[in-house]
Amino acid sequence: MSGERAKRFPLALEDLKRAPRKSEVRSGSGERHAASAVPKAADKPAAVLKPVAKTGAARALPGTTAAKPATAPKPNLLKPAMPQPAAPKLAAPSIAPAGAFALTSERVRERMVERLRANGVTDARVLDAMAAVPRHMFVDPGLATQAYEDAALPIGHQQTISKPSVVARMIELAMAGRTLERVLEIGTGCGYQAAVLSHVARDVYSIERIKPLYERAKLNLRPLRVPNIRLHYGDGRVGLPSAAPFDAIVIAAAGLDVPQALLEQLAIGGRLVAPVGAQSGQHQVLTLVERVAPAQWRESRLDRVFFVPLKSGVI
């Protein structure tokens, strides 16, 4: 290159080829700034690759700083996993058992009814009533799987829900093939027996002396929307004179005898069913009392049973 040409073109041809790439990276910079950047790029070749890596050029060399963007997308790749789509799957186990139990409870009740029939309960209306009432709704959730076993289960406050066989037996004795108009239950408890009675009687009156159980029975019965049950908080030994006389009275607690007030509230021809015996439960007997005249009652002793004691007053 001649001296005159060198003055006009102070840069070599190779430098002129690289200058546009540098000017593309830093748009808006002057020719003088671009010219001064070229020697620096020649001294440090790796620095030239930085713009290439930023623009995603395919010619980035291995072992240079172009390897850094390879790790940069990783946070972006992890972002879709952060919502954890497995979370809804974790909820499935808690829902499935409850749903499965709800679907099978009807069949479990049917098997319970078959056992009742095999044990001597013959009144179809009683069997239908036992099949219609979901007993698992009246016990604690932890005991729901045992709801249709023939067992008494605790409901709190030292009280129990009676065995299905005992509930069916007492209601069948109270009915004696009749259509019941007005029934009084002493000892509402969790409300299960009242719910069964509501299927065989026009009106059911039930008294509970323990306030928390009275409130619990109301909550248990509310989803069933039973229109013919009237719950009362009070002393069961006194009965409910304002609603007497009753076609049937069912007492769900054992006393040494049947309170006279309850005998007086029984209609002529009515039947009272109650466990009678010591509070220890060793000598309790299911007893049937029939009112045959205004001042005459007939008593029959039937089955050995075990009930919580019949107490007076309210708590």
Swiss-Prot record:
Coiled coil: none annotated. Transmembrane segments: none annotated. GO terms for molecular function: protein-L-isoaspartate (D-aspartate) O-methyltransferase activity. Its EC number is 2.1.1.77. Residues 1-47, 59-89 are annotated as: Disordered. It is found in: Cytoplasm. It catalyses: [protein]-L-isoaspartate + S-adenosyl-L-methionine = [protein]-L-isoaspartate alpha-methyl ester + S-adenosyl-L-homocysteine. Keywords: Cytoplasm, Methyltransferase, S-adenosyl-L-methionine, Transferase. Residues 35-47, 59-81 have a biased composition (Low complexity). One of its GO terms (biological process) is protein modification process. HAMAP family: PIMT. This is Protein-L-isoaspartate O-methyltransferase. It comes from Burkholderia ambifaria (strain MC40-6).
